[in-house]
């Protein structure tokens, strides 16, 4: 019984560590993207630019990033739909296999 409890405890810990690693990787990726965004912004801004010109650059960049987010949302929805279809097909195949035996 103790071995089973230890196995469960270790498995839960492993899963928690996996989630924490993924979360940390996401944070690293997000911060790298922020650094890249700021570097891109610095490439566009010149000392002689007006505040309006700088705001226009920022608004254009914001629009581009919003479009990318929308594209990723669409791709995610398509992948989720395909995953549901595959899950349904696997379930149907398992039922057919059980009925065949």
Swiss-Prot record:
Residue ranges of coiled coil: 14-43, 76-96
Compartments where located: Cytoplasm
GO cellular component terms, semicolon-separated: cytosol
Pfam families, sorted: DUF496
Record keywords, A-Z: Coiled coil, Cytoplasm
Origin: domain of life: Bacteria
NCBIfam families tied to this protein: PRK05423.1
Homology family: Belongs to the pole-localizer TmaR family.
Function, in words: Pole-localizer protein involved in the regulation of several cellular processes.
Name this protein carries in UniProt: Pole-localizer protein TmaR
């Amino acid at each position: 019984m103790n071995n089973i409890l230890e196995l469960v405890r270790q498995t839960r810990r492993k899963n928690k560590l996996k989630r924490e690693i993924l979360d940390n990787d996401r944070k690293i990726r997000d911060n790298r993207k922020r650094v890249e965004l700021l570097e891109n912004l610095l490439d566009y801004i010149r000392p002689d630019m007006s505040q309006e010109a700088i705001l226009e650059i920022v608004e254009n960049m914001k629009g581009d990033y919003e479009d990318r987010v929308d594209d990723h949302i669409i791709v995610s929805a398509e992948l989720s739909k395909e995953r549901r279809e595959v899950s349904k097909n696997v379930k149907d195949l398992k039922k057919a296999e059980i009925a065949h035996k």
